[in-house]
Amino acid sequence: MNDPWLKSSIMAKRGVAKGEAGRRHELSITAQGDFHYVYGPYAKPVLTINPGDIVVVETEDAFGGVITSEQDSPTAKLQFPFLNPQCGPVAISGVEKGDCLAVQIHAVETRGEQPAGTTCIIPEFGGLVGTASTAMLNPPLPERVRKMHVDKNGVRWSDKIVLPYQPFIGTIGVSPEIEAISSLQPDYHGGNMDLPDVAPGAILYFPVHTKGGLLYVGDCHAAQGDGELSGVAVEQRATVTLQIDVIKNWSFAWPRLETENFLMTIGSARPLEDAARIAYRELVRWMSADYGFDEIDAYMLLSQAGRIRLGNMVDPKYTMGASILKKYLVS
């Protein structure tokens, strides 16, 4: 743990490994073999690790690498539902249902040939068009693909526009107990949350539903606005470095996130306000369970000091993250 604050994180205080790094594992594209398009308990783990171990994962982009040119047709190239390929699952020794998987994101690094970033318009997909879930008579928007040079200096949208390079993990989570949930969908297990806070320096906390936890990861972005409005971020192949620990007997309903300055709870649902309600309800419960607030006081404080972050407004369920600064967590 290089950042000083990590020594005081929940992961360091309560994790089996106490924040100490263990063995380092490499999960290359070759070692991964077949990708997964659902989160579930039925796939054999590609890797089994111990609490505290570090895993370096090579991920494919959300398109499976098939869109290589601005002349490509997404409709012709993409094969639904085989989108958003996931690496894993990674099993963690000693993890049982009712535990928590703590995942610290060390790095998300762009890999592959330039232009490494891809975004596009996919007909009948996005936040301002008719979709299968929101049926409209309007004709689909025309397809369009944009390829971008991506490096630490920025995302070169055009000769005049350079976006900040803010890499993060779009899709990450654990296995449900018996369900198989599409990698395109976010839910209580995590999944396709598209939340820009899931970035280097953050620690995610997932409720475990099955033995081993079974962590999946993929779909990294180089940049994305709140809501991922058109349905597609600046998609990229990436090398992701994760340190994974276990907190025994810490059970809760939805994913949580910790940074140096704030705590966040994540909810996914339709309509959008229900995702916000889930996120805020879970934050009230966390403040009550671990920080000495009664629920009414927490509810009232969040009305003044809470913040809400829109992850996506395009997926089968929408994602919101509710947060509060740590400096206010004194009851």
Show where each model-derived region lies:
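Short, structured beta-strand/loop micro-motifs enriched in basic residues and often containing a Trp
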Residues: 30-40, 80-87, 181-189, 283
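Intrinsically disordered, low-complexity linker/loop segments enriched in Gly/Pro
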Residues: 107-200
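Short, well-ordered loop/turn sites that connect or cap secondary structure elements
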Residues: 49, 92-95, 198
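A generic structural signal for residues embedded in beta-strands
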Residues: 57, 100-103, 206
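Short, Lys/Arg- and Gly-enriched loop/turn segments at beta-strand edges
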Residues: 62-73, 108-121, 212-222, 311-313
